[in-house]
Amino acid sequence: MTQITRLTALQLSEAIHNRSVSCVEVMNAFLERINTLNPDLNALVNLITQEACLAMAGESDRQLSSGNSAGWLHGIPIAIKDLFNAKGLATTLGSPMFPEAGAQQDDPHVARIRGAGALIIGKTNVPEAGLGGHTRNALFGLTRNGLDRNLSAGGSSGGAATAVSSHMLPLADGSDMMGSLRTPAAFQGIVGFRASAGAIPAATDADPQGLGLTSIGAMARNVSDVSALFTTLCDVPAAHRQSPRGSSGHLKGLRIGWLGNADGHWPMAKGVLAQCQRALENLQGLGAQIDLCTLPFSIADLWFCWLTLRQHSM
């Protein structure tokens, strides 16, 4: 079999469920890689003990032996972004200001991850309070890029991106207010998906003003894994969804606004706009209506608006 930590999340799921590899073997493989890389990369924080990790994996194996699977993530290790609550783990927001007592319950999307069988082994590092395009804080220090330790990991989901790009984890959750999933994913050659506002439920205290600036999303090394995790995170009662389409599989009638590079104001790497154009054509083929947009105000005004809203949301 291909080295366990090189498998995609969906490949791991298949291997675990057809019993070609055990949950304990999977956990041991990822723990070995974490023990080797994380002391330098510093992507994962508040890790539970190795003994506790292996005990969870052993229980997952026993459940499978009894014919019981919690879901497609059964036995797959994952860590939660340290802005969100995972029962029993401290939620520090990367700041010495916040208590390190274990959370009393999972946040809604974390409960979905756990409910699908994932084994939560710790947290992923963030800039303090999740504010910043690079990941470092006074509590845990600097997170390095998983592809090149001399480069920035990006932020604020930098710990998650590094854990995934370095194969310490197969996939991760994250959140994005203005690039916090997409930036670290771009910096590290993986896929980061910012879901539409409200598509994935968040704890009420995550957005007390109800501005909807932050969206939860998924990270992985390929689109298929991101899609699978996104589907799991969206699998909630309709009453909890703000997004009008939820996890619908078709795009007929959906309007998509496209700004492109805002008439040259936003520099793009070579090939990016052409790739986006191909994606727009695919979306149009699935029934979406593409509206080419222009900003009715200056880029400077847009930036000032963003800063004002972010400050208010804090």
Residue ranges and their predicted role:
Residues F30, C53, G75, K81, ...:
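Conserved hydrophobic/aromatic pocket- or pore-lining residues that grip, position, or stack substrates
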Residues A70-L73, R114, V164, H250:
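Extracellular/periplasmic catalytic domains that process cell-envelope and extracellular macromolecules
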Residues M1-N68, T232-M314:
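Amidase signature
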Residues W72-H109:
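Enzymes and membrane/adaptor proteins characterized by extended Gly/Ser/Thr/Asp/Glu-rich
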Residues L44-V45, W72-L73, P77-A79, L119, ...:
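Short, conserved beta-strand segments within well-ordered enzyme catalytic domains
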Residues L12-N18, F98-G102, T214-R221:
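Short, well-ordered beta-strand elements within core beta-sheets of diverse protein domains
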Residues Q105-F230:
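Short glycine/serine-rich loop segments
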